[in-house]
Curated annotation (Swiss-Prot):
InterPro entries named among the record's database cross-references: PP2C (IPR015655), PP2C_BS (IPR000222), PPM-type-like_dom_sf (IPR036457), PPM-type_phosphatase-like_dom (IPR001932)
Keyword Chaperone attached: no
Catalysed reactions listed for this entry: O-phospho-L-seryl-[protein] + H2O = L-seryl-[protein] + phosphate; O-phospho-L-threonyl-[protein] + H2O = L-threonyl-[protein] + phosphate
Protein's organism: Arabidopsis thaliana (Mouse-ear cress)
Protein name: Probable protein phosphatase 2C 79
Cofactor binding description: Binds 2 magnesium or manganese ions per subunit.
Positions of post-translational Phosphoserine modification: 76
Length: 385
């Protein structure tokens, strides 16, 4: 009965995707309505697959895969593969800025040190944060809302037999490890999350702000920092980092009642380094839109049990099917709902699946394949900030 109701509702209120969707394809990927995908491509150490589905009126997720030289000096090392997933909130400006600048900063610092390292990654995050702060300062007088725009920022770097994973916010990187004796796959989460729905993150916020009993507030059954935002770390969200951007003309809902004594949110990434092993088969990098619907283990089993080609798109579809199931509606009906309204049913979802070939990893120093650079989303962006 509820499914019939949604049929009626979608036909009356939301135009069918068959009349409003557009489909195109090129070497960078394919677009089908609100879904963009690159089913299969090669990176330095194997294959990869990408998919993005839009729910917000403006796509707030951005993503990229870069493979080849990881420095600005193309003739020298290190060589590797870089994956970035940037889940924006409050608007698309910060995630787009990160997509345009973070990888370039990483290459610059890697060139200075002639290597990849935790320090290189941290400096790249810091430079990106400082760059966006400059954008906010420049636009504050005419566009104060930009101070309340931010982005989660998850990256992975495969280089010299190591995997570096860095994160701010609540996107997630999960490794699929195969158990040789059984052929089964286990999920190993490599990223730390910074969402105050997690008790340890709330405890961290209380320890950093012992004089503020309202640093984390339960509002409408959801934990939020200062009753406003769920993540405790991000790029951007300058209104919760710099007091000069937490005042008029910023909207009242973003302004704090009491003076800001110190930055409330942090840009500092949690960084892990994993020595890659032969049983490390693939990596899933995804925004929280995927993980709201699928567990880590469910996701790695889908990848393990299906063909590689189009596997990111398959994960997105599995998440959408679960979102439809939660609303007791059909998947086909969910797909008819237009962007904007769709956000009431699920978030923007970005997925990158990176397969790892042990033989290619062992020969990394001798590989000189063409560079790869693909951005997820297939959306024409306005002029850079």
């Amino acid at each position: 009965m509820l499914s019939l109701f949604f049929n009626f509702l979608t036909s009356c209120l939301w135009p069918s995707s068959s009349t409003t969707s557009h489909t195109y394809s090129d070497s960078k990927g394919k677009q089908d309505g609100l879904l963009w995908y690159k089913d299969s491509a090669h990176h330095l150490f194997g294959d990869f697959s990408m998919a993005v589905v839009q729910a917000n009126n403006l796509l707030e997720d951005q993503s990229q895969v870069e493979s080849g030289p990881l420095t600005t000096l193309s003739s020298s090392g290190p060589y590797g593969t870089f994956v970035g997933v940037y889940d924006g909130h409050g608007g698309p400006e910060t995630s787009r800025f990160v997509n345009d600048h973070l990888f370039h900063h990483l290459k610059r610092f890697a060139a200075e040190q002639d290597s990849m390292s935790v320090d290189v990654i941290r400096k790249a995050y810091e430079a990106t944060e400082e760059g966006f702060l400059g954008v906010v300062a420049k636009q504050w007088a005419v566009k104060p809302h930009i101070a309340a725009v931010g982005s989660c920022c998850l990256i992975g770097v495969v280089c010299d037999g190591k995997l570096y994973v860095a994160n701010v916010g609540d996107s997630r990187a999960v490794l699929g490890k195969v158990i040789k004796a059984t052929g089964e796959v286990n999920a190993l989460q490599l990223s730390a999350e910074h969402n105050v729905s997690i008790e340890s993150v709330r405890q961290e916020m209380h320890s950093l702000h012992p004089d503020d009993s309202h640093i984390v507030v339960l509002k409408h059954n959801v934990w939020r920092v200062k009753g406003i935002i769920q993540v405790s770390r991000s790029i951007g969200d300058v209104y919760l980092k710099k007091s000069e951007f937490n005042k008029e003309p910023l909207y009242t809902k973003y302004r704090l009642r009491e003076p800001m004594k110190r930055p409330i949110l942090s840009w500092e990434p949690s960084i892990t380094v994993h020595d890659l092993q032969p049983d490390d088969q693939f990596l899933i990098f995804a925004s929280d839109g995927l993980w709201e619907q699928l567990s880590n283990q469910e996701a790695v089993e889908i990848v393990q049990n299906h063909p590689r080609n189009g596997i990111a798109r398959r994960l997105v579809k599995a998440a959408l099917q679960e979102a439809a199931k939660k609303r007791e509606m059909r998947y086909s009906d969910l797909n008819k709902i237009e962007r904007g309204v769709r956000r009431h049913f699920h978030d923007d979802i970005t997925v990158v699946v990176l397969f790892l070939d042990t033989n290619l990893l062992s020969r990394a120093s001798s590989l000189k394949t063409p560079s790869v650079s693909i951005r997820g989303g297939g959306i024409t962006l306005p002029k850079k900030l």
